[in-house]
Amino acid sequence: MLQELLKNHEIILASGSPRRQKFFQDLEIPVKIDVRPVDEVFSEHLKKEEITDFLSVLKSEVFLNDLKENQILITSDTIVYNEAKALGKPKDHAEAVKMISSLSGKNHEVITSVCFTSKNYQKVLNHSTRVYFSELTEKEIEYYVTNFKPFDKAGGYAIQEWIGLIGIKKIEGSYFNVVGLPTHEVYKTLKEMLNS
């Protein structure tokens, strides 16, 4: 069991996302939360998982000098990839409405990369889930953005909220990845790292 392997290690989760924090709680993996500011800028030539891989590694760099032997740092990044464009978190109401409108009646990819960093080791994994949205009315989109304020969510929506319940007809891949973390992959990778 992973819990036994973790006895002599400390997991640092560099994420302010309450959803990611809850996943670790549900996985029964104790974590120390440490969020440090990073300027999330990436080159325009990067596509899909190249973007999230790059950003998840970038987020780890501010910790490199501080990591102790028994610590494992976990950093991650999620984007919604639609029509060859990466959608991050919307800046405001208008941008959230625009993002969701662009997803309405179509399918898109939600891509998450997770970077595991220890004193002498780094591994990056990524996972993609395809999400299919029904046609949404302008009123539905306005209602969602006004009442749920999805400004901390890639693509301007959360699958587990009202908009997901009424608008998502199917997904291909991990549901938990769309919420913010491919939990099965994280568990497996931590087990491999601690067993090696």
Curated annotation (Swiss-Prot):
SUPFAM superfamilies xref list: ITPase-like
Predominant subcellular localization, coarse grouping: cytoplasm
Catalytic-site annotation from UniProt: D77
Record keywords: Cytoplasm, Hydrolase, Nucleotide metabolism
GO biological process: nucleotide metabolic process
Record-marked site positions (Important for substrate specificity): R19, T78, Q160
Reactions mediated catalytically: dTTP + H2O = dTMP + diphosphate + H(+); UTP + H2O = UMP + diphosphate + H(+)
Keyword Cytoplasm among record annotations: yes
Localisation per UniProt entry: Cytoplasm
Superkingdom of the source species: Bacteria
Gene Ontology CC: cytoplasm
GO molecular function: dTTP diphosphatase activity; UTP diphosphatase activity
Database matches in Gene3D superfamilies: 3.90.950.10
Cofactor(s) it depends on: a divalent metal cation
EC number: 3.6.1.9
Record's function text: Nucleoside triphosphate pyrophosphatase that hydrolyzes dTTP and UTP. May have a dual role in cell division arrest and in preventing the incorporation of modified nucleotides into cellular nucleic acids.
Family, as annotated: Belongs to the Maf family. YhdE subfamily.
Protein name: dTTP/UTP pyrophosphatase
Species for this entry: Christiangramia forsetii (strain DSM 17595 / CGMCC 1.15422 / KT0803)
Source organism phylogeny: Bacteria, Pseudomonadati, Bacteroidota, Flavobacteriia, Flavobacteriales
